[in-house]
Each structure stands twice: as structure tokens, then as C-alpha cells.
Amino acid sequence: WGFADFYGSYYSHYGNRNNTGSLQLFTGNLFLNEESALEGTGQYLIMEDIFSAPSDTLLPAGNYRAAETGEPFTFYAGKKFEDNRESIPSGAFIYYIESDPTKSKIAYVTDGTMKINVSSEGIYDIQCNFTLDGKTELKGTFKSELPHFDRFAVTPASASRHRLKLQSPVN
């Protein structure tokens, strides 16, 4: 299961008028509990900055690649930022959530491609071919409906983006 968020021209104050979206995909053993916190074990892929043309509001079909250009059909690779001694993941990354929280970890998508096809019925077929942390290959497929949420009207560019709360912290 998964969903996409639309943030509009999120980087317009930096001169980039392209639209920005995010994508969050989950393996089947992860679910939301009564408090809307993520529970279970599995993988949780987050891609925060996926760029599309100014006329696109849904995640368009096409071939995407990791690049720092902000051009349509690119996404930002994953990075870890330190802010007040707190690690903050950004860009494209994946949580590996294990039953033993000490074994859970984050891996960053440092390179790769993503191919998106959309059927006439609105079914998204997403093929990922990523390199994690500069060495490990990750290939995966998502095929399902993909709800899109419009965050453009409610999220000023200076605000943080929406993420699901994890039941246990992952370092």
C-alpha cells in the first residue's frame, strides 16, 4: 500500500517553479494502529522530493532518475542531516522495520531510477531500481491504486512535510 502527496511549487522561493511531490510505499506487514502510528515489520520507502512539470498535479507516468537538478522526472537522493545533534533523513530513503527495534535501520537511496506507468483505470505500476548507501541494489515493484493528497494549500514552504509516526524510533 502507499500514497503520494502534492506540494505544488514547494521550491519556488529558490527559483524552481516545478511541482514537487512525495511518495510513501509500504510492504504488506506494516499497518496504522488506532493512534495512526505505523506498526508491524517490513519496509517503508519515502521519496520526499519528486519533481514534475508545473502543469502536473498527480505523479505523472514516466522514467525518473536521482538527480539534484529539480527538473521534471527527477528525485533527490537520500541524505542524513544533523540538526542540533539530531539525525534527520531527507530525500529518498527506506526504513527497515524489524520486530527487534535495535535491528531496525535507515538506508539512503543514493542513485537509481524509477519507472511509473498509470493504467486507464488509475492503477499505478512503479518499478524501482535503486542503489542504497552507495553499494546495495534494491529492486522493487508497486502495483495498486495510489491515493494522492493535496498538501499545497495547507503547507507553507517553510513547514516540515507530513510523515507517519513510527511506533518505535529507527536510527
Regions found by a protein language model. Give the residues of each.
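Surface-exposed helix/loop patches within compact recognition domains
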Residues: 13-116, 171
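Compositionally biased regions
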Residues: 91, 120-121, 161, 169
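Boundary/junction segments of secreted and surface-exposed precursor proteins
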Residues: 1-8
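Short, well-ordered strand-loop elements centered on a beta-strand within folded domains, enriched
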Residues: 57-59, 63-67, 123-128, 154-156
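Edge beta-strand at a domain terminus
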Residues: 111-114, 127-171
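A mature extracytoplasmic/lumenal domain signature
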Residues: 51, 120, 128-132
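A short, structured loop/turn motif at beta-sheet edges
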Residues: 116-124
